[in-house]
């Protein structure tokens, strides 16, 4: 559903931010 898509996008964004910081 839409919530799952939003959760997936949030995880994807968080992963990109984490990789930039590390």
Curated annotation (Swiss-Prot):
GO biological process, one term: symbiont-mediated hemolysis of host erythrocyte
The family this protein is said to belong to: Belongs to the frog skin active peptide (FSAP) family. Ocellatin subfamily.
Expression sites (tissue/organ): Expressed by the skin glands.
The keyword DNA-binding belongs to this UniProt entry's keyword annotation: no
Modified sites of kind Methionine amide: 22
Pfam families in the cross-refs: Antimicrobial15 (PF08110)
Organism in which the protein naturally occurs: Leptodactylus labyrinthicus
Protein name in the entry: Ocellatin-LB1
Gene Ontology CC terms: extracellular region
Keyword Transmembrane helix in record: no
